[in-house]
From Swiss-Prot:
The keyword Plastid does not apply. The chain crosses the membrane at residues 43-63, 100-120, 139-159, 176-196, 210-230, 248-268. Keywords: Cell inner membrane, Cell membrane, Membrane, Transmembrane, Transmembrane helix. It comes from the Bacteria. NCBIfam families: PRK04214.1, yihY_not_rbn. It comes from Neisseria meningitidis serogroup C / serotype 2a (strain ATCC 700532 / DSM 15464 / FAM18). It is a multi-pass membrane protein. Its main location: membrane. Belongs to the UPF0761 family. One of its GO terms (cellular component) is plasma membrane. The lineage of its organism: Bacteria, Pseudomonadati, Pseudomonadota, Betaproteobacteria, Neisseriales. This is UPF0761 membrane protein NMC0462.
C-alpha cells in the first residue's frame, strides 16, 4: 500500500475525518488568538472578579467557609504549583481592593462583568451565534454567575472534599485520599465545564454533547496541570533567568494554556453535532444551503398542518447538519419573516402557498444587484434570469412536484 493510499484510507475513516474537521474549526475560530486575548482580559479582571465574588459570599456568614473553598479551588486551577507567589500577590491585591470607595467598587463590578461578557462573546462566536440575548437577560445571567457561581462552587467543593476524606478514612486507606481528591476535582471540573458549554452559548447544545466536551477538556486540563507542575519541579533553569519574577511568565503561560484548552473544548463540543450522519463531510455551500432551507420549510409546513411546533433537535433527525449551521438558517428565515420561534419550538409564519421559491433563491443563493451595474453584472443577470423564472413557483407547488417525481 502506497503512502497516498494510506492517506486516502485515513480520510475515509470516520474518526480521522472528524478529528481533521475539529482541527480545521480550531484554526478557523482562531482559538490561539482568542486564548491570548482571554489571558490578557483574565489578568486584568481576575482580582476584581475574586473580590466581587468573595464580597458577595461574605454578606452571608454561613457561606464563609464555602467561599474559602472557592478561593482554594481557583488557586489550584488557575495558579499551577511553582507559581504560588502569584496567588499571594492576588490575595494581597484583593485585600487592598476591599478598601475601595463606592466608585472604585462599581468599577470592580464593571470590570468583572466585562470578563464574563468576553467569555460569553467568545463562546457565541465559536457556536456562530448572530443574535445575542436581550441586554437585560445578559445582565441577569452575568450577575447570577458573579453571585451564585462562587457560592455553588464553594458548596460543591466543600461537599466533595468532605466526602473524599470520609471515604478514605472509612476504607482504612488514607493514602488513597490524594487519588480520590483528584477524582473529585476532575468530576467537579467536568460539571463546571458542562454548565459553561451547555448554557453560556445562545444556541441549543445537547446535554450529552456538552458532557462529552466537558469530560475531554477536564482530562486535558488535569493532565496539563500535572505536566506543568512536573516540569516546574524538575527543570528550574528558568529561575536563573527570571530570578524572583520566574513565577510571572509561567503564570501567563499557564493562563494561556488554560484558555486554549477550554476554548478548544468548546470547539469540540460545537463540532459534535456534525457527527451524526457524517455532516462534517459536507460543504456548507450555497446549493446545500438552499436545499436545507427548503427542507426546513417543508418540515415546518408539515408540522403546521398537524398544529404543532418543531424544536431544534427535531430538524436534525431529518437534515444532516450541525446545530450552528441550522441555527444560522433558522435565524435568517426568522429575520425575513418566514418563521418565528415560540415556546414549543419553531413555527411557520405563513402558508406554503405564499412562499415563493425564487425569493428564497435570491435570499440564500443569488440576488440581482439593485444599483447601477457594469457589463459583467448585466451578463450574469441575463444568465440567471431564466433560472429565477424557472423557480417562479410556491413552496406548496414544489412540494407537490417533488412528491410526484418520487412516486414516478
Amino acid at each position: 500500500m502506497t503512502f497516498l493510499q494510506r492517506l486516502q484510507g485515513l480520510a475515509d475513516n470516520k474518526i480521522c475525518a472528524f478529528a481533521w474537521f475539529v482541527v480545521r474549526r480550531f484554526d478557523e475560530e482562531r482559538v490561539p488568538q482568542a486564548a491570548a486575548s482571554m489571558t490578557f482580559t483574565t489578568l486584568l479582571a481576575l482580582v476584581p472578579v475574586l473580590t466581587v465574588m468573595v464580597a458577595v459570599a461574605s454578606i452571608f456568614p454561613v457561606f464563609d467557609r464555602w467561599s474559602d473553598s472557592f478561593v482554594s479551588f481557583v488557586n489550584q486551577t488557575i495558579v499551577p504549583q511553582g507559581a504560588d507567589m502569584v496567588f499571594d500577590y492576588i490575595n494581597a491585591f484583593r485585600e487592598q481592593a476591599n478598601r475601595l470607595t463606592a466608585i472604585g467598587s462599581v468599577m470592580l463590578v464593571v470590570t468583572s462583568l466585562m470578563l464574563i461578557r468576553t467569555i460569553d462573546n467568545t463562546f457565541n462566536r465559536i457556536w456562530r451565534v448572530n443574535s445575542q440575548r436581550p441586554w437585560m437577560m445578559q445582565f441577569l445571567v452575568y450577575w447570577a454567575l458573579l453571585t451564585f457561581g462562587p457560592l455553588s462552587l464553594g458548596v460543591g467543593i466543600s461537599f466533595m472534599v468532605g466526602s473524599v476524606q470520609d471515604a478514605a478514612l472509612a476504607s482504612g486507606a488514607p493514602q488513597w485520599s490524594g487519588a480520590l481528591r483528584t477524582a473529585a476535582t476532575l468530576t467537579f471540573m467536568t460539571l463546571l465545564l458542562w454548565g459553561l458549554y451547555r448554557f453560556v452559548p445562545n444556541r441549543f447544545v445537547p446535554a450529552r454533547q456538552a458532557f462529552v466536551g466537558a469530560l475531554a477538556t477536564a482530562f486535558c486540563l488535569e493532565t496539563a496541570r500535572s505536566l506543568f507542575t512536573w516540569y516546574m519541579g524538575n527543570f528550574d533553569g528558568y529561575r536563573s533567568i527570571y530570578g524572583a519574577f520566574a513565577a510571572v511568565p509561567f503564570f501567563l503561560l499557564w493562563l494561556n494554556l488554560l484558555w486554549t484548552l477550554v476554548l478548544g473544548g468548546a470547539v469540540l463540543t460545537s463540532s459534535l453535532s456534525y457527527w451524526r450522519g457524517e455532516a462534517f463531510r459536507r460543504g456548507f455551500d450555497s446549493r446545500g444551503r438552499f436545499d436545507d432551507v427548503l427542507k426546513i420549510l417543508l418540515l415546518l409546513d408539515a408540522a403546521q398542518k398537524e398544529g404543532k411546533a418543531l424544536p431544534v433537535q427535531e430538524f436534525r433527525r431529518h437534515i444532516n447538519m450541525g446545530y450552528d449551521e441550522l441555527g444560522e438558517l433558522l435565524e435568517k428565515l426568522a429575520r425575513h419573516g418566514y418563521i418565528y420561534s415560540g415556546r414549543q419550538g419553531w413555527v411557520l409564519k405563513t402558508g406554503a402557498d405564499s412562499i415563493e421559491l425564487n425569493e428564497l433563491f435570491k435570499l440564500f443563493v443569488y440576488r440581482p444587484l439593485p444599483v447601477e451595474r457594469d457589463h459583467v453584472n448585466q451578463a450574469v443577470d441575463a444568465v440567471m434570469t431564466p433560472c429565477l423564472q424557472t423557480l417562479n413557483m410556491t413552496l406548496a407547488e414544489f412540494d407537490a412536484q417533488a412528491k410526484k417525481q418520487q412516486q414516478s
